Amino acid sequence: MGKVIGIDLGTTNSAMAVYEGNEAKIIANKEGKNTTPSIVAFTDKGEILVGESAKRQAVTNPEKTIYSIKRIMGLMFNEDKAKEAEKRLPYKIVDRNGACAIEISGKVYTPQEISAKILMKLKEDAESYLGESVTEAVITVPAYFNDSQRKATKEAGTIAGLNVLRIINEPTSAALAYGLDKKESEKIMVYDLGGGTFDVTVLETGDNVVEVLATGGDAFLGGDDFDNRVIDFLASEFKSETGIEIKNDVMALQRLKEAAENAKKELSSAMETEINLPFITADATGPKHLVKKLTRAKFESLTEDLMKETISKIESVIKDAGLTKNEISEVVMVGGSTRIPKVQERVKAFINKDLNKSVNPDEVVAVGASIQGGVLKGDVKDVLLLDVTPLSLGIETLGGVMTKVIDRGTTIPAKKSQVFSTAEDNQPAVSIMVLQGERELARDNKSLGKFDLQGIAPAPRGVPQIEVTFDIDANGILTVSAQDKNTGKSQEIKISGSSGLSDSEIEKMVKDAELHKEEDAKKKEVIEARNHADSLAHQTQKSLDEHKTNLNENDANEIQNAINALKDCVKNDNATKAELEDKTKLLAQAAQKLGEAMANKNNAEQPKKKDDDVIDAEVE
Protein backbone atom coordinates (compact mmCIF):
# COMPACT_ATOMS: atom_id res chain seq x y z
CA MET A 1 0.00 0.00 0.00
CA GLY A 2 1.57 3.28 -1.15
CA LYS A 3 1.01 6.72 0.23
CA VAL A 4 -2.56 7.93 0.72
CA ILE A 5 -3.11 11.57 -0.21
CA GLY A 6 -5.70 13.80 1.43
CA ILE A 7 -7.62 15.97 -1.03
CA ASP A 8 -9.77 19.02 -0.32
CA LEU A 9 -11.81 19.17 -3.54
CA GLY A 10 -13.05 22.74 -3.23
CA THR A 11 -15.55 24.84 -5.16
CA THR A 12 -12.99 27.56 -5.90
CA ASN A 13 -9.63 25.96 -5.05
CA SER A 14 -8.40 22.48 -4.21
CA ALA A 15 -5.49 21.36 -2.04
CA MET A 16 -3.70 18.11 -1.22
CA ALA A 17 -1.53 16.78 1.57
CA VAL A 18 0.26 13.61 2.61
CA TYR A 19 1.09 12.10 6.00
CA GLU A 20 4.73 11.00 6.12
CA GLY A 21 7.49 11.10 8.69
CA ASN A 22 4.93 11.45 11.51
CA GLU A 23 3.55 14.71 10.16
CA ALA A 24 1.05 15.96 7.61
CA LYS A 25 2.57 18.00 4.78
CA ILE A 26 0.87 20.11 2.14
CA ILE A 27 1.84 19.05 -1.38
CA ALA A 28 2.62 21.93 -3.74
CA ASN A 29 1.39 21.59 -7.32
CA LYS A 30 3.73 21.66 -10.34
CA GLU A 31 3.36 25.45 -10.45
CA GLY A 32 4.78 25.59 -6.91
CA LYS A 33 1.52 26.68 -5.25
CA ASN A 34 -0.26 25.05 -2.32
CA THR A 35 -3.71 25.44 -3.86
CA THR A 36 -4.96 24.71 -7.37
CA PRO A 37 -7.94 26.58 -8.91
CA SER A 38 -10.84 24.14 -9.38
CA ILE A 39 -11.21 25.21 -13.01
CA VAL A 40 -11.24 23.18 -16.23
CA ALA A 41 -11.15 24.74 -19.71
CA PHE A 42 -11.63 23.33 -23.20
CA THR A 43 -9.75 25.23 -25.90
CA ASP A 44 -10.58 25.55 -29.60
CA LYS A 45 -7.49 23.43 -30.36
CA GLY A 46 -8.93 20.52 -28.39
CA GLU A 47 -6.68 20.98 -25.37
CA ILE A 48 -7.98 20.52 -21.83
CA LEU A 49 -6.49 22.94 -19.30
CA VAL A 50 -6.76 22.51 -15.54
CA GLY A 51 -5.93 24.91 -12.70
CA GLU A 52 -3.95 28.12 -13.21
CA SER A 53 -3.69 27.71 -16.99
CA ALA A 54 -7.49 27.35 -17.23
CA LYS A 55 -8.05 30.37 -14.99
CA ARG A 56 -5.72 32.60 -17.03
CA GLN A 57 -7.73 32.22 -20.23
CA ALA A 58 -11.22 32.40 -18.66
CA VAL A 59 -12.01 35.94 -19.88
CA THR A 60 -11.36 35.09 -23.53
CA ASN A 61 -13.04 31.66 -23.35
CA PRO A 62 -15.91 32.02 -20.82
CA GLU A 63 -18.36 29.52 -22.30
CA LYS A 64 -15.80 26.70 -22.28
CA THR A 65 -14.22 27.49 -18.91
CA ILE A 66 -15.83 25.44 -16.15
CA TYR A 67 -15.62 26.71 -12.58
CA SER A 68 -17.72 26.04 -9.44
CA ILE A 69 -18.68 22.60 -10.82
CA LYS A 70 -19.06 21.45 -7.20
CA ARG A 71 -22.24 23.55 -7.04
CA ILE A 72 -24.07 21.16 -9.37
CA MET A 73 -22.43 17.94 -8.15
CA GLY A 74 -25.16 15.35 -7.51
CA LEU A 75 -27.89 17.92 -8.28
CA MET A 76 -31.12 17.08 -10.09
CA PHE A 77 -31.83 19.23 -13.14
CA ASN A 78 -35.31 20.20 -11.92
CA GLU A 79 -34.10 21.48 -8.52
CA ASP A 80 -34.34 25.21 -7.80
CA LYS A 81 -30.61 25.33 -7.05
CA ALA A 82 -29.90 24.05 -10.56
CA LYS A 83 -32.00 26.84 -12.05
CA GLU A 84 -30.11 29.38 -9.92
CA ALA A 85 -26.76 27.94 -11.04
CA GLU A 86 -27.91 28.12 -14.67
CA LYS A 87 -28.47 31.86 -14.33
CA ARG A 88 -25.09 32.46 -12.70
CA LEU A 89 -22.73 30.26 -14.69
CA PRO A 90 -21.67 31.13 -18.27
CA TYR A 91 -21.49 27.53 -19.47
CA LYS A 92 -24.51 25.49 -20.56
CA ILE A 93 -26.16 23.24 -17.93
CA VAL A 94 -28.24 20.39 -19.41
CA ASP A 95 -30.44 17.51 -18.26
CA ARG A 96 -28.74 14.10 -18.30
CA ASN A 97 -30.96 11.29 -17.01
CA GLY A 98 -32.64 13.82 -14.70
CA ALA A 99 -29.32 15.02 -13.25
CA CYS A 100 -27.32 18.16 -14.00
CA ALA A 101 -24.57 17.97 -16.59
CA ILE A 102 -22.84 20.51 -18.81
CA GLU A 103 -22.51 20.79 -22.56
CA ILE A 104 -19.30 21.93 -24.27
CA SER A 105 -19.12 22.07 -28.08
CA GLY A 106 -21.99 19.62 -28.41
CA LYS A 107 -20.52 17.08 -25.96
CA VAL A 108 -22.13 16.41 -22.57
CA TYR A 109 -19.96 16.05 -19.46
CA THR A 110 -21.13 15.11 -15.98
CA PRO A 111 -19.89 17.08 -12.94
CA GLN A 112 -18.06 13.88 -11.96
CA GLU A 113 -16.05 13.93 -15.20
CA ILE A 114 -15.09 17.60 -14.78
CA SER A 115 -14.15 17.06 -11.12
CA ALA A 116 -12.15 13.99 -12.19
CA LYS A 117 -10.00 16.19 -14.44
CA ILE A 118 -9.16 18.36 -11.40
CA LEU A 119 -8.43 15.25 -9.34
CA MET A 120 -6.24 13.83 -12.13
CA LYS A 121 -4.08 16.96 -12.08
CA LEU A 122 -3.78 16.76 -8.29
CA LYS A 123 -2.91 13.06 -8.56
CA GLU A 124 -0.22 13.70 -11.22
CA ASP A 125 1.25 16.63 -9.26
CA ALA A 126 1.32 14.52 -6.09
CA GLU A 127 3.11 11.73 -7.98
CA SER A 128 5.66 14.24 -9.26
CA TYR A 129 6.18 15.58 -5.72
CA LEU A 130 6.40 12.17 -4.02
CA GLY A 131 8.28 10.39 -6.79
CA GLU A 132 5.93 7.41 -6.74
CA SER A 133 2.56 6.31 -8.05
CA VAL A 134 -0.51 7.48 -6.10
CA THR A 135 -3.65 5.34 -6.27
CA GLU A 136 -5.44 5.96 -2.96
CA ALA A 137 -7.00 9.07 -1.47
CA VAL A 138 -9.23 10.48 1.22
CA ILE A 139 -11.47 13.19 -0.27
CA THR A 140 -13.38 15.77 1.73
CA VAL A 141 -16.93 17.02 1.17
CA PRO A 142 -19.08 19.65 2.90
CA ALA A 143 -20.73 18.20 6.00
CA TYR A 144 -24.13 19.11 4.61
CA PHE A 145 -23.62 17.22 1.32
CA ASN A 146 -26.43 14.72 0.83
CA ASP A 147 -26.03 11.10 -0.19
CA SER A 148 -26.12 11.74 -3.94
CA GLN A 149 -23.48 14.48 -3.68
CA ARG A 150 -21.18 12.20 -1.67
CA LYS A 151 -21.64 9.34 -4.13
CA ALA A 152 -20.92 11.68 -7.07
CA THR A 153 -17.70 12.84 -5.37
CA LYS A 154 -16.56 9.24 -4.91
CA GLU A 155 -17.38 8.53 -8.57
CA ALA A 156 -15.19 11.48 -9.61
CA GLY A 157 -12.30 9.93 -7.70
CA THR A 158 -12.87 6.58 -9.39
CA ILE A 159 -12.89 8.19 -12.86
CA ALA A 160 -9.60 9.93 -11.97
CA GLY A 161 -8.00 6.56 -11.22
CA LEU A 162 -8.14 6.89 -7.44
CA ASN A 163 -9.37 4.35 -4.94
CA VAL A 164 -11.26 6.65 -2.56
CA LEU A 165 -10.70 5.03 0.83
CA ARG A 166 -12.92 7.48 2.67
CA ILE A 167 -15.20 10.45 2.11
CA ILE A 168 -14.76 12.73 5.13
CA ASN A 169 -16.62 15.90 6.13
CA GLU A 170 -14.60 19.10 5.67
CA PRO A 171 -15.11 20.57 9.18
CA THR A 172 -14.40 17.17 10.74
CA SER A 173 -11.20 17.00 8.71
CA ALA A 174 -10.22 20.49 9.90
CA ALA A 175 -10.89 19.47 13.50
CA LEU A 176 -8.73 16.38 13.02
CA ALA A 177 -5.84 18.60 11.90
CA TYR A 178 -6.44 21.06 14.73
CA GLY A 179 -7.18 18.61 17.54
CA LEU A 180 -4.79 15.73 16.89
CA ASP A 181 -2.34 16.78 19.60
CA LYS A 182 -4.95 18.00 22.09
CA LYS A 183 -4.87 16.00 25.31
CA GLU A 184 -7.45 18.00 27.24
CA SER A 185 -11.08 17.51 26.31
CA GLU A 186 -12.42 20.51 24.38
CA LYS A 187 -15.68 21.32 22.68
CA ILE A 188 -14.77 23.18 19.51
CA MET A 189 -16.79 24.72 16.75
CA VAL A 190 -15.51 24.68 13.17
CA TYR A 191 -16.92 27.53 11.07
CA ASP A 192 -16.19 26.61 7.45
CA LEU A 193 -17.12 29.21 4.83
CA GLY A 194 -15.64 28.15 1.51
CA GLY A 195 -16.09 29.17 -2.10
CA GLY A 196 -19.44 27.48 -2.60
CA THR A 197 -20.51 25.84 0.64
CA PHE A 198 -20.94 26.64 4.32
CA ASP A 199 -20.68 24.20 7.22
CA VAL A 200 -20.67 24.62 10.96
CA THR A 201 -19.80 21.65 13.14
CA VAL A 202 -19.50 21.23 16.89
CA LEU A 203 -17.04 18.55 17.97
CA GLU A 204 -15.48 17.20 21.11
CA THR A 205 -11.74 16.57 20.86
CA GLY A 206 -9.24 15.22 23.33
CA ASP A 207 -7.10 12.18 24.06
CA ASN A 208 -6.93 11.36 20.32
CA VAL A 209 -10.70 11.17 19.91
CA VAL A 210 -12.56 13.51 17.57
CA GLU A 211 -16.32 13.15 18.02
CA VAL A 212 -18.86 15.14 16.04
CA LEU A 213 -21.71 16.29 18.26
CA ALA A 214 -23.75 18.14 15.62
CA THR A 215 -23.38 19.54 12.15
CA GLY A 216 -25.32 21.82 9.83
CA GLY A 217 -24.90 24.21 6.98
CA ASP A 218 -25.86 25.11 3.45
CA ALA A 219 -24.43 23.38 0.38
CA PHE A 220 -25.20 26.53 -1.65
CA LEU A 221 -23.74 29.35 0.43
CA GLY A 222 -20.15 30.50 0.01
CA GLY A 223 -17.71 33.02 -1.40
CA ASP A 224 -19.31 32.73 -4.85
CA ASP A 225 -22.50 34.20 -3.38
CA PHE A 226 -20.59 37.15 -1.93
CA ASP A 227 -19.05 37.69 -5.39
CA ASN A 228 -22.49 37.49 -7.01
CA ARG A 229 -23.80 40.31 -4.81
CA VAL A 230 -20.96 42.53 -6.05
CA ILE A 231 -21.61 41.44 -9.66
CA ASP A 232 -25.32 42.29 -9.34
CA PHE A 233 -24.49 45.66 -7.80
CA LEU A 234 -21.99 46.58 -10.53
CA ALA A 235 -24.31 45.39 -13.31
CA SER A 236 -27.22 47.35 -11.85
CA GLU A 237 -25.14 50.53 -11.52
CA PHE A 238 -23.83 50.12 -15.07
CA LYS A 239 -27.34 49.62 -16.45
CA SER A 240 -28.67 52.72 -14.70
CA GLU A 241 -25.80 54.75 -16.18
CA THR A 242 -25.77 53.33 -19.73
CA GLY A 243 -29.02 51.41 -20.21
CA ILE A 244 -27.01 48.28 -21.12
CA GLU A 245 -27.67 44.91 -19.43
CA ILE A 246 -24.07 43.79 -19.14
CA LYS A 247 -24.86 40.34 -17.71
CA ASN A 248 -26.16 39.20 -21.11
CA ASP A 249 -22.58 39.34 -22.45
CA VAL A 250 -20.74 36.20 -21.25
CA MET A 251 -17.27 37.69 -21.78
CA ALA A 252 -18.22 40.85 -19.89
CA LEU A 253 -19.79 38.71 -17.15
CA GLN A 254 -16.54 36.76 -16.74
CA ARG A 255 -14.60 40.02 -16.41
CA LEU A 256 -17.15 41.18 -13.82
CA LYS A 257 -16.74 37.93 -11.89
CA GLU A 258 -12.95 38.28 -11.71
CA ALA A 259 -13.25 41.95 -10.72
CA ALA A 260 -15.81 41.15 -8.00
CA GLU A 261 -13.63 38.40 -6.54
CA ASN A 262 -10.56 40.66 -6.53
CA ALA A 263 -12.55 43.51 -4.95
CA LYS A 264 -13.78 41.19 -2.19
CA LYS A 265 -10.20 40.13 -1.43
CA GLU A 266 -8.88 43.71 -1.47
CA LEU A 267 -11.61 44.85 0.91
CA SER A 268 -10.36 42.37 3.49
CA SER A 269 -7.40 44.71 4.05
CA ALA A 270 -8.52 48.04 2.51
CA MET A 271 -11.53 50.21 3.31
CA GLU A 272 -12.13 51.05 -0.35
CA THR A 273 -11.22 49.68 -3.77
CA GLU A 274 -11.74 50.78 -7.36
CA ILE A 275 -13.10 48.46 -10.02
CA ASN A 276 -11.80 49.57 -13.41
CA LEU A 277 -12.88 47.61 -16.48
CA PRO A 278 -12.13 49.54 -19.69
CA PHE A 279 -13.94 48.56 -22.91
CA ILE A 280 -16.31 46.28 -21.00
CA THR A 281 -18.86 46.57 -23.84
CA ALA A 282 -19.99 48.92 -26.61
CA ASP A 283 -23.12 50.32 -28.24
CA ALA A 284 -23.88 52.57 -31.21
CA THR A 285 -22.27 55.53 -29.43
CA GLY A 286 -18.96 53.71 -28.95
CA PRO A 287 -17.07 51.70 -26.32
CA LYS A 288 -18.16 51.72 -22.67
CA HIS A 289 -15.97 51.53 -19.57
CA LEU A 290 -16.95 50.42 -16.08
CA VAL A 291 -15.25 52.41 -13.33
CA LYS A 292 -16.71 52.17 -9.83
CA LYS A 293 -15.51 52.64 -6.28
CA LEU A 294 -16.65 50.05 -3.75
CA THR A 295 -16.27 50.64 -0.02
CA ARG A 296 -16.04 47.95 2.62
CA ALA A 297 -19.22 49.31 4.20
CA LYS A 298 -21.12 48.93 0.91
CA PHE A 299 -19.79 45.40 0.43
CA GLU A 300 -20.93 44.52 3.95
CA SER A 301 -24.41 45.91 3.33
CA LEU A 302 -24.69 43.94 0.06
CA THR A 303 -23.83 40.68 1.87
CA GLU A 304 -25.45 41.32 5.27
CA ASP A 305 -28.13 38.64 4.87
CA LEU A 306 -25.56 36.00 3.89
CA MET A 307 -23.56 36.62 7.07
CA LYS A 308 -26.77 36.61 9.10
CA GLU A 309 -27.69 33.23 7.63
CA THR A 310 -24.40 31.71 8.85
CA ILE A 311 -25.06 32.96 12.40
CA SER A 312 -28.52 31.38 12.30
CA LYS A 313 -26.89 28.05 11.40
CA ILE A 314 -24.45 28.38 14.32
CA GLU A 315 -27.35 28.81 16.74
CA SER A 316 -29.19 25.71 15.54
CA VAL A 317 -26.08 23.49 15.50
CA ILE A 318 -25.05 24.46 19.05
CA LYS A 319 -28.63 23.69 20.12
CA ASP A 320 -28.53 20.30 18.31
CA ALA A 321 -25.29 19.49 20.17
CA GLY A 322 -27.11 20.04 23.46
CA LEU A 323 -24.76 22.87 24.43
CA THR A 324 -24.81 26.59 25.07
CA LYS A 325 -22.42 28.92 23.27
CA ASN A 326 -20.57 29.49 26.55
CA GLU A 327 -19.54 25.81 26.54
CA ILE A 328 -17.65 26.20 23.25
CA SER A 329 -13.91 26.28 24.06
CA GLU A 330 -12.56 27.27 20.63
CA VAL A 331 -13.90 28.53 17.31
CA VAL A 332 -11.71 27.38 14.41
CA MET A 333 -12.14 29.42 11.22
CA VAL A 334 -11.80 27.46 7.97
CA GLY A 335 -12.25 28.39 4.30
CA GLY A 336 -10.98 31.36 2.30
CA SER A 337 -14.16 33.39 2.86
CA THR A 338 -13.47 33.56 6.62
CA ARG A 339 -10.87 36.23 5.77
CA ILE A 340 -13.74 38.71 5.30
CA PRO A 341 -13.45 41.03 8.34
CA LYS A 342 -17.22 41.33 8.88
CA VAL A 343 -17.59 37.55 8.91
CA GLN A 344 -14.99 37.32 11.69
CA GLU A 345 -16.61 40.21 13.54
CA ARG A 346 -20.07 38.61 13.35
CA VAL A 347 -18.91 35.21 14.59
CA LYS A 348 -16.81 36.71 17.38
CA ALA A 349 -19.70 38.90 18.55
CA PHE A 350 -22.11 35.96 18.62
CA ILE A 351 -19.84 33.45 20.33
CA ASN A 352 -18.31 36.13 22.61
CA LYS A 353 -14.72 34.89 22.43
CA ASP A 354 -11.63 35.37 20.29
CA LEU A 355 -11.46 33.26 17.15
CA ASN A 356 -8.75 30.68 16.59
CA LYS A 357 -6.98 31.62 13.37
CA SER A 358 -3.89 29.48 13.98
CA VAL A 359 -4.69 27.16 11.08
CA ASN A 360 -4.28 28.08 7.41
CA PRO A 361 -7.91 28.28 6.22
CA ASP A 362 -7.00 27.14 2.69
CA GLU A 363 -4.91 24.13 3.72
CA VAL A 364 -6.21 22.73 7.02
CA VAL A 365 -8.94 20.57 5.43
CA ALA A 366 -6.46 18.78 3.14
CA VAL A 367 -4.09 18.34 6.09
CA GLY A 368 -6.87 16.68 8.11
CA ALA A 369 -7.74 14.41 5.18
CA SER A 370 -4.11 13.27 4.97
CA ILE A 371 -4.17 12.47 8.70
CA GLN A 372 -7.27 10.34 8.12
CA GLY A 373 -5.30 8.66 5.31
CA GLY A 374 -2.56 8.01 7.85
CA VAL A 375 -5.12 6.49 10.22
CA LEU A 376 -6.43 4.17 7.51
CA LYS A 377 -2.89 3.15 6.52
CA GLY A 378 -1.86 2.58 10.14
CA ASP A 379 0.71 5.38 10.29
CA VAL A 380 -1.36 7.34 12.81
CA LYS A 381 -2.13 5.23 15.86
CA ASP A 382 -4.98 5.36 18.37
CA VAL A 383 -6.96 8.12 16.66
CA LEU A 384 -10.72 7.62 16.70
CA LEU A 385 -12.90 9.71 14.41
CA LEU A 386 -16.62 9.65 15.15
CA ASP A 387 -18.63 11.45 12.47
CA VAL A 388 -22.41 11.81 12.17
CA THR A 389 -25.15 11.84 9.55
CA PRO A 390 -26.02 15.43 8.54
CA LEU A 391 -29.65 14.59 7.68
CA SER A 392 -32.23 12.01 8.71
CA LEU A 393 -32.86 8.97 6.50
CA GLY A 394 -36.16 7.16 6.14
CA ILE A 395 -38.91 5.88 3.85
CA GLU A 396 -42.29 7.04 2.60
CA THR A 397 -45.18 5.38 4.43
CA LEU A 398 -48.97 5.47 4.15
CA GLY A 399 -50.38 8.92 3.45
CA GLY A 400 -47.15 10.31 2.04
CA VAL A 401 -45.46 10.60 5.43
CA MET A 402 -41.70 10.32 5.94
CA THR A 403 -40.90 7.75 8.62
CA LYS A 404 -37.33 8.14 9.89
CA VAL A 405 -35.12 5.08 10.28
CA ILE A 406 -31.78 6.80 11.01
CA ASP A 407 -32.03 10.17 12.76
CA ARG A 408 -29.90 13.18 11.96
CA GLY A 409 -26.79 13.29 14.15
CA THR A 410 -26.41 9.50 14.38
CA THR A 411 -22.76 8.44 14.65
CA ILE A 412 -21.59 6.59 11.54
CA PRO A 413 -21.10 3.89 10.43
CA ALA A 414 -24.61 2.86 11.51
CA LYS A 415 -27.13 0.11 10.81
CA LYS A 416 -30.77 0.30 11.89
CA SER A 417 -33.91 -1.69 11.08
CA GLN A 418 -37.65 -1.12 11.41
CA VAL A 419 -40.56 -3.43 10.66
CA PHE A 420 -43.36 -2.18 8.39
CA SER A 421 -46.41 -3.86 6.92
CA THR A 422 -48.83 -3.72 3.98
CA ALA A 423 -51.53 -1.07 3.51
CA GLU A 424 -54.02 -3.30 1.64
CA ASP A 425 -55.36 -6.86 1.89
CA ASN A 426 -53.45 -9.44 -0.19
CA GLN A 427 -50.93 -6.83 -1.30
CA PRO A 428 -48.35 -8.75 -3.45
CA ALA A 429 -45.57 -6.13 -3.38
CA VAL A 430 -44.37 -3.01 -1.58
CA SER A 431 -42.51 -0.03 -3.03
CA ILE A 432 -39.77 1.37 -0.81
CA MET A 433 -39.11 5.08 -1.45
CA VAL A 434 -35.87 6.09 0.30
CA LEU A 435 -35.79 9.69 1.56
CA GLN A 436 -33.33 12.12 3.15
CA GLY A 437 -34.32 15.24 5.07
CA GLU A 438 -36.09 16.63 8.11
CA ARG A 439 -39.59 17.42 6.78
CA GLU A 440 -42.67 15.49 7.89
CA LEU A 441 -44.09 14.89 4.42
CA ALA A 442 -42.24 12.68 1.95
CA ARG A 443 -42.66 15.10 -0.95
CA ASP A 444 -40.77 17.83 0.96
CA ASN A 445 -37.66 15.66 1.39
CA LYS A 446 -35.05 14.53 -1.12
CA SER A 447 -35.74 11.22 -2.83
CA LEU A 448 -32.61 9.05 -2.95
CA GLY A 449 -34.04 6.04 -4.76
CA LYS A 450 -36.86 3.53 -5.02
CA PHE A 451 -37.12 -0.26 -5.21
CA ASP A 452 -39.84 -2.93 -5.04
CA LEU A 453 -40.11 -6.04 -2.88
CA GLN A 454 -42.19 -8.59 -4.82
CA GLY A 455 -43.74 -11.93 -3.90
CA ILE A 456 -45.38 -11.10 -0.57
CA ALA A 457 -47.68 -13.99 0.44
CA PRO A 458 -51.43 -13.11 0.40
CA ALA A 459 -52.52 -11.88 3.82
CA PRO A 460 -54.77 -9.25 5.41
CA ARG A 461 -53.35 -5.75 5.59
CA GLY A 462 -51.04 -5.18 8.53
CA VAL A 463 -50.15 -8.88 8.88
CA PRO A 464 -47.00 -9.26 6.69
CA GLN A 465 -43.81 -8.16 8.40
CA ILE A 466 -41.44 -6.24 6.11
CA GLU A 467 -38.11 -5.48 7.79
CA VAL A 468 -36.41 -2.44 6.25
CA THR A 469 -32.71 -2.03 7.10
CA PHE A 470 -30.64 1.11 6.54
CA ASP A 471 -26.87 0.55 6.48
CA ILE A 472 -24.74 3.70 6.21
CA ASP A 473 -20.98 3.27 5.86
CA ALA A 474 -18.08 5.42 7.08
CA ASN A 475 -18.28 7.48 3.86
CA GLY A 476 -21.89 8.39 4.63
CA ILE A 477 -23.08 6.29 1.66
CA LEU A 478 -26.25 4.28 2.13
CA THR A 479 -27.52 0.77 1.35
CA VAL A 480 -31.19 -0.05 2.03
CA SER A 481 -32.67 -3.56 2.11
CA ALA A 482 -36.17 -4.95 2.66
CA GLN A 483 -37.05 -8.51 3.70
CA ASP A 484 -40.39 -10.29 4.02
CA LYS A 485 -39.87 -12.06 7.36
CA ASN A 486 -42.49 -14.67 6.45
CA THR A 487 -41.11 -15.80 3.07
CA GLY A 488 -37.49 -14.72 3.53
CA LYS A 489 -37.56 -12.90 0.18
CA SER A 490 -35.41 -9.80 0.14
CA GLN A 491 -34.34 -6.92 -2.07
CA GLU A 492 -31.74 -4.20 -1.60
CA ILE A 493 -30.61 -0.98 -3.22
CA LYS A 494 -27.22 0.66 -2.88
CA ILE A 495 -28.16 4.29 -3.20
CA SER A 496 -26.43 5.64 -6.28
CA GLY A 497 -27.74 9.07 -5.53
CA SER A 498 -28.89 11.41 -8.26
CA SER A 499 -25.69 11.24 -10.24
CA GLY A 500 -27.44 9.41 -13.06
CA LEU A 501 -24.36 7.23 -13.58
CA SER A 502 -24.49 3.45 -13.71
CA ASP A 503 -21.49 1.30 -12.79
CA SER A 504 -20.88 0.62 -16.49
CA GLU A 505 -20.94 4.36 -17.27
CA ILE A 506 -18.45 5.05 -14.48
CA GLU A 507 -16.25 2.24 -15.82
CA LYS A 508 -16.47 3.76 -19.32
CA MET A 509 -15.48 7.18 -17.95
CA VAL A 510 -12.50 5.63 -16.16
CA LYS A 511 -11.41 4.08 -19.47
CA ASP A 512 -12.05 7.34 -21.33
CA ALA A 513 -9.93 9.22 -18.80
CA GLU A 514 -7.15 6.65 -19.15
CA LEU A 515 -7.48 6.78 -22.94
CA HIS A 516 -7.24 10.56 -22.85
CA LYS A 517 -4.08 10.23 -20.77
CA GLU A 518 -2.57 7.94 -23.43
CA GLU A 519 -3.60 10.37 -26.19
CA ASP A 520 -1.91 13.20 -24.32
CA ALA A 521 1.25 11.12 -23.97
CA LYS A 522 1.18 10.34 -27.71
CA LYS A 523 0.66 14.02 -28.55
CA LYS A 524 3.63 14.87 -26.34
CA GLU A 525 5.77 12.29 -28.15
CA VAL A 526 4.83 13.84 -31.52
CA ILE A 527 5.68 17.32 -30.21
CA GLU A 528 9.05 16.10 -28.91
CA ALA A 529 9.78 14.37 -32.24
CA ARG A 530 8.79 17.57 -34.09
CA ASN A 531 11.03 19.71 -31.86
CA HIS A 532 13.97 17.33 -32.35
CA ALA A 533 13.42 17.31 -36.12
CA ASP A 534 13.17 21.09 -36.30
CA SER A 535 16.36 21.49 -34.26
CA LEU A 536 18.28 18.99 -36.44
CA ALA A 537 17.08 20.64 -39.68
CA HIS A 538 18.10 24.08 -38.40
CA GLN A 539 21.55 22.97 -37.21
CA THR A 540 22.27 20.94 -40.36
CA GLN A 541 21.21 23.83 -42.62
CA LYS A 542 23.52 26.16 -40.70
CA SER A 543 26.45 23.72 -41.00
CA LEU A 544 25.75 23.03 -44.68
CA ASP A 545 25.74 26.74 -45.53
CA GLU A 546 29.08 27.10 -43.74
CA HIS A 547 30.86 24.01 -45.14
CA LYS A 548 29.17 23.47 -48.52
CA THR A 549 32.44 24.18 -50.37
CA ASN A 550 34.02 21.12 -48.74
CA LEU A 551 31.40 18.79 -50.28
CA ASN A 552 30.93 17.57 -53.82
CA GLU A 553 27.76 18.79 -55.52
CA ASN A 554 25.88 15.47 -55.30
CA ASP A 555 26.46 15.13 -51.53
CA ALA A 556 25.47 18.77 -50.93
CA ASN A 557 22.24 18.33 -52.93
CA GLU A 558 21.41 15.08 -51.12
CA ILE A 559 21.78 16.80 -47.72
CA GLN A 560 19.77 19.85 -48.83
CA ASN A 561 16.96 17.62 -50.13
CA ALA A 562 16.89 15.73 -46.81
CA ILE A 563 16.74 19.07 -44.91
CA ASN A 564 13.86 20.28 -47.12
CA ALA A 565 11.97 17.00 -46.69
CA LEU A 566 12.33 17.20 -42.90
CA LYS A 567 11.26 20.86 -42.81
CA ASP A 568 8.15 20.01 -44.86
CA CYS A 569 7.37 17.19 -42.44
CA VAL A 570 7.77 19.55 -39.45
CA LYS A 571 5.35 22.04 -41.05
CA ASN A 572 2.75 19.31 -41.65
CA ASP A 573 0.42 19.37 -38.62
CA ASN A 574 -0.78 15.86 -39.47
CA ALA A 575 2.69 14.32 -39.54
CA THR A 576 2.98 11.29 -37.27
CA LYS A 577 5.77 10.54 -34.82
CA ALA A 578 6.99 7.72 -37.12
CA GLU A 579 7.09 10.03 -40.17
CA LEU A 580 9.02 12.67 -38.26
CA GLU A 581 11.47 10.09 -36.91
CA ASP A 582 11.97 8.53 -40.38
CA LYS A 583 12.73 11.89 -42.00
CA THR A 584 14.99 12.79 -39.06
CA LYS A 585 16.89 9.51 -39.47
CA LEU A 586 17.31 10.10 -43.24
CA LEU A 587 18.74 13.56 -42.62
CA ALA A 588 21.05 12.25 -39.91
CA GLN A 589 22.37 9.62 -42.34
CA ALA A 590 22.79 12.13 -45.18
CA ALA A 591 24.49 14.58 -42.84
CA GLN A 592 27.22 12.06 -41.95
CA LYS A 593 29.08 13.15 -45.10
CA LEU A 594 28.84 16.73 -43.90
CA GLY A 595 30.32 15.68 -40.55
CA GLU A 596 33.16 13.90 -42.32
CA ALA A 597 33.87 16.99 -44.47
CA MET A 598 33.91 19.21 -41.36
CA ALA A 599 36.29 16.80 -39.58
CA ASN A 600 38.61 16.60 -42.61
CA LYS A 601 38.71 20.38 -42.82
CA ASN A 602 39.62 20.65 -39.10
CA ASN A 603 42.34 18.02 -39.48
CA ALA A 604 43.79 19.81 -42.52
CA GLU A 605 43.92 23.09 -40.63
CA GLN A 606 45.71 21.60 -37.58
CA PRO A 607 49.58 21.50 -37.64
CA LYS A 608 50.98 18.01 -38.12
CA LYS A 609 52.56 16.35 -35.09
CA LYS A 610 55.05 13.53 -34.82
CA ASP A 611 53.38 10.22 -34.17
CA ASP A 612 56.19 8.77 -32.04
CA ASP A 613 53.89 8.44 -29.04
CA VAL A 614 50.92 6.98 -30.95
CA ILE A 615 50.08 3.38 -30.09
CA ASP A 616 48.39 1.35 -32.81
CA ALA A 617 45.56 -0.54 -31.11
CA GLU A 618 41.85 -1.33 -31.22
CA VAL A 619 39.51 0.00 -28.60
CA GLU A 620 36.37 -1.89 -27.63
UniProtKB/Swiss-Prot annotation:
Answer whether the UniProt record assigns the keyword Lyase to this protein. Answer: no
Provide one Gene Ontology cellular component. Answer: cytosol
| Induction of its expression | By stress conditions e.g. heat shock.
Keyword annotations of the record: ATP-binding, Chaperone, Nucleotide-binding, Phosphoprotein, Stress response
Which GO biological process categories is it annotated with?
A: chaperone cofactor-dependent protein refolding; protein refolding
Any one Gene Ontology molecular-function term assigned to this protein's record: protein folding chaperone
Q: Where, per the database record, does this protein carry Phosphothreonine?
A: 197
Q: Where is this region: Disordered?
A: 597-620
- Has UniProt tagged this entry with the keyword Ribosomal protein? no
Give the highest taxon in the source lineage: Bacteria
Q: What NCBIfam families does this protein's entry cite?
A: PRK00290.1, PRK05183.1, prok_dnaK
Similarity remark: Belongs to the heat shock protein 70 family.
| PANTHER family per UniProt | HEAT SHOCK PROTEIN 70KDA
Functional note: Acts as a chaperone.
The name under which this protein is listed is Chaperone protein DnaK
